[in-house]
Structures are given as C-alpha cells and as structure tokens.
Amino acid sequence: MSTQDRVNLRVTHHFSAVPERVFDAWLDPEKTKKFLFTTPTGQMVRVEIDARAGGKFRITDRRDGEDVDHVGEYLEIDRPRRLVFTFTVPKYSTASTMVTIEIVPKGSGCVLTLTHEGVLPEWADATKGGWAGILAALAAEL
C-alpha cells in the first residue's frame, strides 16, 4: 500500500490543566503509564522513554496475556507547545506513522490537537477512537 492510500487523523481535546502539565505528562513514565496505550483489561508492563530529539520510547501493555508494544522515536520536543514522534505497533503493522501534538493555551487551561499521519485506512476508526480515549484518560489523570 502506498503512502497515498493512507489517511491523516486529527483529534482535539480541551484540558483544564496548563500547557506545561499536559505536555510533561507525555514524557513522564510515571504519568504516561496511567493513560497512554492503556486498555480497560490490560496491564502496563513497561514504559521506557528517552525524552530527547532522537530518543526512543517503548510502551508495552499486556492484553489477554499477550504483550503489545508501542514504539517510536521523538523527532521534535518543543515544551510546552509541540511534540512530534514516529509511531508503530509492530504486532499489527510494521508501517511507521507520525504523530504531532500541538498545545495552545486557552483561558486557564489549554487545547491539545493531535494529528496522526499515515494511518492505514482499515485502522482509521479504531485509531481515532483510541486517541480520543487516550486524551480523555490524560484529562482524568491531570
């Protein structure tokens, strides 16, 4: 499948927390394990984050007795405005995609816009729903 066949997704969420708190949660393993790629029946078994441009991450959730890795590399870290990373879930696809998180202050909180580029069409609905759930879980943790 060519990259032309892929889709881009966008999810927006309003947070009552300040941009710095929202941004920092994405790079803090203790916070990340509570909201990122967690599932209701899963168990977080590993969170490795090298929070620098060129650094890598690996987040592993155990689902129904099977480990599911979420891996990527940080391409840009501009606290508290922008975070860009590659993203792959090897169990489901070897295709690498790109995620951009942009955070803009709004009132006493902020608005986060997450753009996921290069998603396979058959995964678009599940991926968009997954990101919406992740952002809601992040809001609950903050």
Which residues does each predicted region cover?
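Hydrophobic ligand-binding cavity/cleft-lining segments
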Residues: 1-42
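A generic structural micro-feature
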Residues: 3-7, 49-51, 64-68, 91-95
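Structural motif
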Residues: 5, 16, 77-79, 106
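Intrinsic-disorder/low-complexity, polar/charged segments enriched in Ser/Thr/Lys/Arg/Asp/Glu/Gln
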Residues: 6-12, 44, 56, 69, ...
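Hydrophobic/aromatic beta-strand elements that line small-molecule binding cavities or substrate pockets
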Residues: 13, 47, 70-75, 97-104
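Glycine-rich portal/gate segments that line the openings of hydrophobic small-molecule binding cavities
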Residues: 43-86
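Beta-strand/loop substructures that line and gate deep hydrophobic ligand-binding cavities in soluble
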Residues: 84-133, 138
